[in-house]
């Protein structure tokens, strides 16, 4: 039996500036840390990516043709302020005005993110968000955008504070490539939520047009053996690292007793001390009820088991199934439940985890107001044939997740839209161009777009509101 989604539900597609735009060195754009990091550590760069900088009229026309009425776009901070602050780059400002005008022309609502993993190099090399000065630079950049781009109706401050700290200071797959540093991880999370709160407080105080929220990656954590208290504790601690610390700060304006006990335990075992100031919490408390929405990025869940050894994390960047490892001293280890499917990159496919995560937000953070699923999708080594991709596995993945969203709405959650990652194939931070997510196949040499089977299926769902 099919399941319904609301008539006003947004069926969107998601992009990000650095992963889609290309044009990383033209029209006055300043460098970001990724430019050098990719050149030095990987076999690919973000040039030309999907050339969205030039191809956006094509992509937005496809949105209109395929029933996609929302798009996630991020502004490249260094395209507006090449050094992160100071002089404004007029060509960057002009580009985003043209982009938003094209969105309006095609009747596609832009949900605009201010920071999607791409701090300008000048600020990044000066400590990124570990340096409190950069919090103020971010707020000033946000203020400029709120005032300049008044045509935008939906703003998000940050995309995925969790994976930023995780990538930069735990796994080391993001610049500056530091591993296993929990002090930096939690401090980065705290300072970024503080920057978010300051931007939200400014937005509301100045009465800017539109709505504002934050996008969080929320992978659901389960105990491998629910009857083993040590497995239960491992899941709780991993949830604090990736989810609860950030959600508490955003929606409670403080860290709950349980959260701080977990953080202090992790820091005691692994070393480190946090700088949490009284004035930080004044700012966080002032903002906690002002978020207009929460964006949830959900791809997978994890099962956690007890673990006594040293920390070792191996990131599977090549699609060699089973090659990843995640075990943290004093926390636990990820242990795959063999009965649950996973991708070649060891991402566990578990739609129920999205339902459980939405339910958790509804229960623990009742001031959330509304939710958008701002990313969800299946990365695949797509086979291009007959000028398309027969991506039935992707269709199945999206269908299952839309079904549990329908269930969550029926059970009282206020979920207003879904943005598939990704609109078209884009550059992937730690996988380059092999791992594809898009509704539209991109030939990265010619930049031609081809609708996949999933694009036609998604069009039908957006028209009928049925899955």
Swiss-Prot record:
This protein's pathway: Carbohydrate metabolism; lactose degradation; D-galactose 6-phosphate and beta-D-glucose from lactose 6-phosphate: step 1/1
Keyword set includes Ubl conjugation: no
Regulation affecting activity: Inhibited by both galactose-6-phosphate and ATP.
GO cellular component, one term: cytosol
Keywords, in A-Z order: Glycosidase, Hydrolase
Up-regulation conditions: Induced during growth on lactose or lactulose.
EC number: 3.2.1.85
Pfam families: Glyco_hydro_1 (PF00232)
Protein name according to UniProt: 6-phospho-beta-galactosidase
Organism expressing this protein natively: Leptotrichia buccalis (strain ATCC 14201 / DSM 1135 / JCM 12969 / NCTC 10249 / C-1013-b)
Encoding gene (name): lacG
